[in-house]
């Protein structure tokens, strides 16, 4: 199921993340601090519950969920969103909705990397992780 995602991943490259955060509505100061952070992502599976934990000097966040079931999430920039995550062709697809807005976050394996693509309206950010 999601075994290919399990493990500890470290951020190695980030493209367009500031523009993405700006489109989401993240304030200037938070964008600057978050943009400099180099988070580790720890993904684990326990039965049918998947946990994604992000650890950085900026903030630690954790979500635990079952595929296809909506859940409440407080994001690293303190947005309160409704999220749903599905597995589509080997890609974890997360949709966050809040205040009439939505953003899509896709997590996929490419070779030995984990690629995270964040899309809000016409702005796309790509963040690449390698095993830690």
Swiss-Prot record:
Binding locations of a fatty acid: 127-129
Post-translational modification N-acetylcysteine, affected residues: 2
Pfam families: Lipocalin
Phosphotyrosine PTM positions: 20
Keyword tRNA processing found: no
Locus of motif Nuclear localization signal: 22-32
GO MF annotations in UniProt: hormone receptor binding; long-chain fatty acid binding; long-chain fatty acid transmembrane transporter activity
Chain coiled-coil ranges: none
GO cellular component: cytoplasm; nucleus
Family, as annotated: Belongs to the calycin superfamily. Fatty-acid binding protein (FABP) family.
Biological function: Lipid transport protein in adipocytes. Binds both long chain fatty acids and retinoic acid. Delivers long-chain fatty acids and retinoic acid to their cognate receptors in the nucleus. FABPs are important elements related to the hibernating state in mammals.
Name of the featured protein: Fatty acid-binding protein, adipocyte
